[in-house]
Amino acid sequence: MMELPNGNCNGSSLNVCNGNGNLSNNDSLNWGMAADSMRGSHLDEVKRMVEEYRKAVVPLGGKGLTISQVAAVATQNTGVAVELAEETRYAVKASSDWVVDSMNKGTDSYGVTTGFGATSHRRTKQGGALQNELIRFLNAGIFGNGTESTQTLPHTATRAAMLVRINTLLQGYSGIRFEIMEAIAKFLNHNITPCLPLRGTITASGDLVPLSYVAGLLIGRPNSKSIGPNGQILNAKEAFQLAGIETGFFELQPKEGLALVNGTAVGSGLASLALFETNLLVVLSEILSAIFAEVMQGKPEFTDHLTHKLKHHPGQIEAAAIMEHILDGSYYVKAAQKVHDIDPLQKPKQDRYALRTSPQWLGPQIEVIRNATKMIEREINSVNDNPLIDVSRNKALHGGNFQGTPIGVSMDNTRLAIASIGKLMFAQFSELVNDFYNNGLPSNLTGSRNPSLDYGFKGAEIAMASYCSELQYLANPVTNHVQSAEQHNQDVNSLGLISSRKTAEAVEILKLMSSTFLVALCQAIDLRHIEENLKSVVKNTVSQVAKRVLTVGVNGELHPSRFCEKDLLNVVEREYVFAYIDDPCSATYPLMQKLRHVLVDHALENGDREGNSSTSIFQKIGAFEQELKTLLPKEVESVRVDVENGNPAVPNRIIECRSYPLYKFVRENLGTSLLTGEKIRSPGEECDKVFAALCDGRFIDPMLDCLKEWNGAPLPIC
């Protein structure tokens, strides 16, 4: 928007020419403003959003409103106060007075002296009555009273719409009194929310039907219903009394009804809520991808800055830098490197795409979401009705700013990005629970002693498939389903609110997926902790038994089998613990088979000495296995008990990682724990706790704490 120190005759900050008929701003097309709004990192922008969201007051002046401020007013009820900028009063009054003066002079203006839409050929001099009729015929929504289905727009979306509509009207181009905006602000500040229908708008000419119910409350229509701060149902009179509006119902002046309903505020308000959450969830998905790499023993080189610098896309570069920061210095990354060094053939040279290309996958989604955010922020600071009152040129401009195409397009794009994030999350989850891919974690992430009675996250994986399928369906565009409406006057329309509603649904599903994935990642972290403790005790026990049984012969002499210990320990080091630990000494499991294999190989190399019982390695095998069967199960059980009692010999290494704040939040603040078949608690109960935290914002601080040390740049290329 072009801003000049001296406003035009409307009293607003917008001007078109400098007095000589020349454009007064070299960014007259606003591309520079749009580009400037994208400066800095996405994470910094999210941090600013969170900071704004937590402020106690949202000042409204017709410009500078952000999606985070909309979300704050919409979701925090009386926790955030709305204040109208007094300096906007003059411009608002000027346009309102112009409408009245214009009608008194007999000027013919759409919606003031004419009918509406395709019937605008009709004429009347009863300006106030015309506005009342506008509200009456637009009250065409269905609420489903007496049925199980709810057809009412959510409370938060309605509050968002009210806030956005005030902001656009304050710019002084709509021909409406300042007192009406003050009344709407009082309803917001007293947490009184009119009931708006969920459906019935095509967001061109604006969100006519739902906004007519806000207008219906203001004029005291008998069918007007509101929800009070305690959930009580209020009629219009009760709502006015509770809000402290002493002037009584408004008698609409010419154009005021049209000014209230002919805007995109419902679609853009709900879009603001969806985007506020989406911006947070995409940062969460970056961190979850990094944690996924940690627990999967991934190779961190996929985040190397040179790779992403050569691709040039800023979203990808930032996603990689964030993951690189999480993985830098991670204990799991260091441990994985040791695994790769010991046996480079134990896993593929390259990690699978869901891990290795996660920055390339998430980067474009970040860019789409950022662009949609800026588009919606421009929309909620726009004048969206028709006609527009240009006091400075003494004319009413008949145009089409009510066309909510920026909402429909940005929401379609956002929904596609959300679906892509969910698809990546599902692919990562599927690898995590599959013991063929997860580098030693148990199948289904089972945590019990007996895997035959523990199927872990099998149900959660099925649920994730369901979530992902629905999310992919929702990714289909809304805006290509336009129907010609209102006697073919509204022959193209944006479907902005419908697209916003579908995007809000997609956000909910992504939260379901994110909460399930986060619980699974915490389970994997705990299983890595158990794995490390179990491997340690198995190595110690094998070492002790080897020293006791294999070092000396029957007469106390040094025995050739003493050289087997190193190779025996290498077997333990390389073998996945959860492949045998439920019955560590079973002859059908790989541990005992490979330990025996080592001893047999050494016996074959022992040559002629195998014929002598005092030097035969082969004859030691039975004693070694018997001793191991006596000791190892007891030691394994002892370690399990110690871990369960919070006294592990090896601490949980997540404490040493930058991802720890999120793990700590899930485990300590939300009270979740390792899921096993031996416990009563189900996966869904734990996922519900995390989902609630994603919905109410409690996850934000621990999420950002994971990145508090990041300086906003990738590690240098050395």
UniProtKB/Swiss-Prot annotation:
InterPro entries assigned: Aromatic_Lyase, Fumarase/histidase_N, L-Aspartase-like, Phe/His_NH3-lyase_AS, Phe_NH3-lyase, Phe_NH3-lyase_shielding_dom_sf
UniProt keywords, alphabetically: Cytoplasm, Lyase, Phenylalanine catabolism, Phenylpropanoid metabolism
Chief localization: cytoplasm
Pfam families named in the record: Lyase_aromatic
Regions annotated as coiled coil: none
EC number from the UniProt entry: 4.3.1.24
Gene Ontology BP, a term: cinnamic acid biosynthetic process
UniProt keyword Nuclease, yes or no: no
Descriptive protein name: Phenylalanine ammonia-lyase 2
Source organism of the structure: Cicer arietinum (Chickpea)
Gene name of this polypeptide: PAL2
